[in-house]
A protein has these predicted regions:
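Glycine-rich phosphate-binding active-site loops on the catalytic face of alpha/beta enzymes
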Residues: 22-24, 79-90, 131-132, 137-165
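Surface-exposed amphipathic alpha-helices with a cationic face
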Residues: 10, 45-53, 73, 115-121, ...
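Structural preference for beta-strand elements that scaffold enzyme active sites
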Residues: 15-19, 55-59, 78-81, 125-127, ...
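Active-site beta->alpha loop and helix N-cap motifs at the rims of alpha/beta catalytic domains
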Residues: 1-33
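Glycine/Thr-rich beta-alpha phosphate-binding loop at enzyme active sites
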Residues: 25-36, 68-120, 124, 160-164
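Glycine- and other small-residue-rich loops at beta-strand/loop junctions that grip anionic moieties
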Residues: 33-37, 58-61, 103-107, 127-131, ...
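Aromatic/hydrophobic pocket-lining residues that form the small-molecule binding cavity
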Residues: 2, 41, 45, 65, ...
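Catalytic cores of alpha/beta
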Residues: 2-8, 63-75, 117-123, 128, ...
Length: 170
């Protein structure tokens, strides 16, 4: 799947890089999660590097990102993204459970911890992801060791969040 995707996208000059998500908790069939297997991560990173000369970052799970970031660096990733959402479950009164990813400001302290610890272990850039809501959050992530940030959940509240953050309006 990765090979098909990268080969299909390589033809477009306007694509300057990729983020390879190794930990999305929002998938239907969760029989095996690849982030639990170091060999799988090693093979994905090595294969991605063989397929492209473009920049690529490995988006790592929050609970093993510190451990696997050096492996991503060793096998050719240009950066790591920390972190993805945390898996969670919501219970409804009709006794239905819905699982998915927990994101937003609640995960920011854990994301900052992971960046702080990982920055001691690797030289490649860390992209912060998780709970960035305003300019202060961006500063915290950068001061903790990130070189860039991703903006996600806040876009549901403010579709122009990036502009507002850049202008220090958030």
């Amino acid at each position: 799947e990765l090979k098909e995707m990268i080969e299909g996208l390589e033809q477009f000059d306007f694509i300057c890089g990729y983020e390879i998500n190794l930990s999305c908790p929002n998938v239907k069939h969760k029989t095996i999660m690849p982030f639990l297997n170091k060999n799988y991560i090693k093979e994905i990173v090595k294969n991605a590097r063989k397929l492209t000369k473009k920049f690529f970052s490995m988006k790592l799970p929050p609970y093993t990102g510190i451990e696997y970031a050096p492996l991503c660096e060793e096998y050719g990733a240009d950066a790591v993204t920390l972190n993805n959402t945390y898996p969670g479950v919501v219970y409804y009164e009709d006794k239905k459970f819905i699982s998915g990813g927990i994101s937003g400001p609640v995960i920011k302290p854990m994301m900052l911890y992971n960046i702080f610890q990982t920055a001691k272990l690797i030289k490649i850039p860390i992209i912060a992801s998780g709970g960035i809501q305003n300019y202060k959050d961006v500063e915290e992530a950068l001061n903790t060791g990130a070189k860039a940030v991703q903006i996600g959940s806040i876009n549901f509240i403010y579709p122009d969040a990036i502009k507002r953050i850049l202008n220090k309006e958030l």
